[in-house]
Amino acid sequence: MNTKTTNFTFAFDKKNLNLAETIIKKYPPNGKRSAILPLLDLAQRQNGGWLHISAIEYVANMLEMPYMRAYEVATFYSMFNLSPVGKYHIQVCTTTPCWLRGSDDIMKICEKKLAIKHKETTKDQKFTLSEIECLGACVNAPVVQINDDYYEDLNEAKMEKLIEQYLNDL
């Protein structure tokens, strides 16, 4: 889906609007822009795991900041997805420690088992496969993040088993 041409208007639902207002109150009145990360995350979670352009604009307006500043934040951090992702977003860390411990093999297993490549989503919208920069768990490399869960000390067999579990919806 092209996020620039889709007619879609984002707004927090009542529950998330209350949560957003609570988050904003944690910051001083002149520093509410600092709530940008948690509010973008909240918007992404409400929107099925990705940020539509209108969600970024909505958050920017809520924080009384220029849209471009919010967009810069959303595009800088790899935790934000600017296009739809599958139900299970598999992110393989490929930075040096993980690469040295076999992240290339982990990526190949994912591609083979799911029949997709990096930055693709399965036809049933169940899986999206991505590379991600350091997840901060280098001591337990290689590491994969699936949605909010980390899986560490992986090898090909462990990754195959993990994918099977997700194929069966755990």
Curated annotation (Swiss-Prot):
Enzyme Commission number(s): 7.1.1.-
Q: Which domain of life is it from?
A: Bacteria
Q: Which UniProt keywords apply?
A: 2Fe-2S, Iron, Iron-sulfur, Metal-binding, NAD, Quinone, Translocase
Q: Which Gene3D superfamilies match?
A: Glutaredoxin (3.40.30.10), NADH-quinone oxidoreductase subunit E (1.10.10.1590)
Q: Name one Pfam family in it.
A: 2Fe-2S_thioredx
Q: Where does [2Fe-2S] cluster bind?
A: C93, C98, C134, C138
Q: Which reaction does it catalyse?
A: a quinone + NADH + 5 H(+)(in) = a quinol + NAD(+) + 4 H(+)(out)
- List cofactor names only: [2Fe-2S] cluster
Any binding details for the cofactor?
A: Binds 1 [2Fe-2S] cluster.
Q: Which residues form the signal peptide?
A: none
Q: What does this protein do?
A: NDH-1 shuttles electrons from NADH, via FMN and iron-sulfur (Fe-S) centers, to quinones in the respiratory chain. Couples the redox reaction to proton translocation (for every two electrons transferred, four hydrogen ions are translocated across the cytoplasmic membrane), and thus conserves the redox energy in a proton gradient.
- The molecule here is called NADH-quinone oxidoreductase subunit E
Q: Which organism is it from?
A: Rickettsia typhi (strain ATCC VR-144 / Wilmington)
Q: What is the lineage of its organism?
A: Bacteria, Pseudomonadati, Pseudomonadota, Alphaproteobacteria, Rickettsiales
Chain's gene name:
nuoE
